Amino acid sequence: MARVTVEDCLENVDNRFELVMLASKRARQLATGGKEPRLPWENDKPTVVALREIAAGLVDYNVIAQDEIVAEEPLFAAFEEDSNEAL
């Protein structure tokens, strides 16, 4: 298990702020069981696995955004259904 450095991660992310945001969201996905790791876990904590994935170029905002996309319903969908039944 090699150490992960910030410099390794910054090769795949624009700046440190984006690195922190990306790593924290990915670590939360791994910790809650929402997603499977793309690298062997090797008895690491979720934050370390997230940083290793970023350094390897396996995770970017496209991977994170897939979980954040939520199917949207119209704001007044329930009201519209009730009014259609009344007609």
UniProtKB/Swiss-Prot annotation:
SMART domains in UniProt: RNA_pol_Rpb6
CC terms in the record's Gene Ontology section: DNA-directed RNA polymerase complex
Gene3D superfamilies: 3.90.940.10
Catalyzed reaction equations: RNA(n) + a ribonucleoside 5'-triphosphate = RNA(n+1) + diphosphate
Enzyme Commission number, as recorded: 2.7.7.6
GO annotation, biological process: DNA-templated transcription
Subunit-level organization: The RNAP catalytic core consists of 2 alpha, 1 beta, 1 beta' and 1 omega subunit. When a sigma factor is associated with the core the holoenzyme is formed, which can initiate transcription.
Name assigned to this protein: DNA-directed RNA polymerase subunit omega
UniProt organism field: Azotobacter vinelandii (strain DJ / ATCC BAA-1303)
